[in-house]
């Protein structure tokens, strides 16, 4: 399917076959200064049926996996660490987002048929999931940096501080996502079905730039720099001091951070490229807009996939998580105590900070 841009009276634009963009902004009208010469813009996206199958699998895995993670952490009161509290909140964010996946999937297949209120709510949950995820991981990186590099008992060891920090992260995530919540609505573009989109009137381009740059700066780039700084020095300390026991205890945390970056970094890099194109920092052409639009579609699916991956990390890398899950199953008679004994009791590794070991 294509969109034909024509030089009509008053530079109006005829949009034919405008498809549901699903919140990633590709295929929107070009900026006001664009040269409106005839231009054929492809809106062909990934196979809808394949996307529906992937979303359905992600939904089921995320629903089951994150529920089990929350169960294991909440059940393991003894030995629960500050990091576990952060990971518990991370699982909550992924679970909340997973609950919206069926709605997003249906909108890909049939357009947005759920009205403006639900459009605002699911868009808010999607943004809050991303921002809370990277902010929680940034807090974990700072806690590990202080505990290992400086060998200090951090303020976050005081449980009331941990609660306030987590509440602050959720509040900041909502604030960063608030513009999307305010301006998203069920919108009817010309020659298209309803979409869940932000319609900002004549100043759409300018406001969309602001809505992108500020959250990307404070909700992605700055936390990413904090994580790179903290984990860079943490890794250097672990390897230079040959602290193998702490290195093993950090494997799960490093894996969680790595998977988050692999899933969400591509989408945000493409989004930055799209923003630069709309700001005329890089030239806007039909081909470039097509390429960025397809890249946004593909990388967004990768970002959605992240919501079901953390539980898999805990299962394959986190020995304590596996043992905690088997222990719960044994208590409820789902497996024998002999089978639990064969799994063995993982040793909890201590540290100078007192909280390097985690339930996972």
Curated annotation (Swiss-Prot):
Post-translational modification: Phosphorylated upon ligand binding; which is required for desensitization.
Gene Ontology CC annotation, any one: external side of plasma membrane
Sorted UniProt keywords: Cell membrane, Chemotaxis, Disulfide bond, G-protein coupled receptor, Glycoprotein, Membrane, Phosphoprotein, Receptor, Transducer, Transmembrane, Transmembrane helix
Gene3D superfamilies: Rhodopsin 7-helix transmembrane proteins (1.20.1070.10)
UniProt KW Protein biosynthesis keyword: no
Sequence ranges on the Extracellular membrane side: 1-48, 106-120, 184-208, 274-294
Cell compartments where the protein resides: Cell membrane
Glycosylation (residues): 10, 24
Membrane-related topology note: Multi-pass membrane protein
InterPro entries (alphabetical): CCR1-9-like, Chemokine_CXCR1, Chemokine_CXCR_1/2, GPCR_Rhodpsn, GPCR_Rhodpsn_7TM
Pfam family, one: 7tm_1
GO molecular function annotation: C-C chemokine binding; C-C chemokine receptor activity; C-X-C chemokine receptor activity; interleukin-8 binding
Chief location of this protein within or outside the cell: membrane
Cytoplasmic topological intervals: 76-84, 143-163, 232-251, 316-360
UniProt-listed GO biological process terms: calcium-mediated signaling; immune response; neutrophil chemotaxis; positive regulation of cytosolic calcium ion concentration
Disulfide bonding pattern of the chain: 119-196
Ranges that cross the membrane: 49-75, 85-105, 121-142, 164-183, 209-231, 252-273, 295-315
Superkingdom per UniProt: Eukaryota
Family named by the database record: Belongs to the G-protein coupled receptor 1 family.
Subunit field text: Interacts with IL8. Interacts with GNAI2.
Function as written in the Swiss-Prot or TrEMBL entry: Receptor for interleukin-8 which is a powerful neutrophil chemotactic factor. Binding of IL-8 to the receptor causes activation of neutrophils. This response is mediated via a G-protein that activates a phosphatidylinositol-calcium second messenger system. Binds to IL-8 with high affinity. Also binds with high affinity to CXCL3, GRO/MGSA and NAP-2.
Name of the protein described by the UniProt record: C-X-C chemokine receptor type 2
